[in-house]
Amino acid sequence: MKFTVRVKPNSKKIFFRKEEDGSVTIAVREPALEGKANEAVIETISREMKIPKRKIRIVSGEKGKKKTIEIDP
């Protein structure tokens, strides 16, 4: 399963929200430095969707705010 995520690093609030266009917006406290925000995004997806982190990977957009996430079955 693949889906698009918009990330808001350095956020005061942490949230996981589905948008009308089918994408997901995730706000994390971690900065977009050295992959910290990416790790937080994977942790947030894992917690919200109740799937192991090892099954989640960022397919594209590792250095941008718009990312494509893939979840292995």
From Swiss-Prot:
Transmembrane ranges, per UniProt, are none
One Gene Ontology cellular component term attached to this UniProt record is: cytoplasm
Cross-referenced SUPFAM superfamilies: YggU-like (SSF69786)
Instruction: Fetch the Pfam families from UniProt.
Output: DUF167 (PF02594)
**Could you name the domain of life of the organism this protein comes from?**
Bacteria
Query: Which family is annotated?
Result: Belongs to the UPF0235 family.
Q: What name does the UniProt record give this protein?
A: UPF0235 protein LBJ_1240
What organism does the UniProt record list as the source?
A: Leptospira borgpetersenii serovar Hardjo-bovis (strain JB197)
